[in-house]
Amino acid sequence: MDIATLLGLFGGLGVIVASIFLGGSVNTFVNIPSIVVVVGGTFMVTLCQISLAQFLGSFKVTLRAFMHKSIPPEKLIEEAIGLADVARKEGILALEGNDIDDKFLDDGIKLCIDGHSTETVQKMLSKDINLELDRQNTGILMFKSIAEAAPAMGMIGTLIGLVQMLANMDDPKSIGPAMAVALLTTLYGAIIANAIALPIAAKLKAISAHERLNKLLVLESVAGIQDGMNPRVLQQQLVAYLPESKRELNAGK
């Protein structure tokens, strides 16, 4: 469970809700037609940009923003070096049955044990990386689309409200309440875009970048293990994937 995402998302929404409660009547900020225009319109516009299957599949990708727990790259390096040491001393078949934490690394080692060539293994793993990134990018695209559509639908709802207000100006006392209702759609659109969609899109993008880096690290690890590379030489290559502050510490192990 990613506490930072939950805290940021619900904390941001909580601040908005708290300000509404402290500022006056809650009912003033609730208007069903405005909600229908913004929420319904936003999702319909988003559906125009991606397929229904991608739209539904994106919600599974969204869970990664809250449930994602990746393996630190330094741990991947440590595991890869251990496997490389065994493979160099006892042969690649000695890795069969090893308990490997990272599934992608485990898949790569199994391909090596099955006797596939280095080129074939690299091609299959690279394809897996690209397809996974495509799936993640669909989720990111959906939330970016929501972030773009929500304010626009909010503005459309506000314009609808203004037209209705201007068409019924016989009673001056009704102008203020009608204007408030018209502006609610803009508020809803801004909240959906800036407090929900944009933060989730940014989080998914950060997770995708981190996973891509980890998988490229594994890709190079598998190639080194399969080629019988010296574990120390492999370690020197892999520490390049770490932040500068962690490279010297990891290289000294």
Model-found features: residue ranges?
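Large intracellular
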Residues: 4, 8, 15-139, 211-253
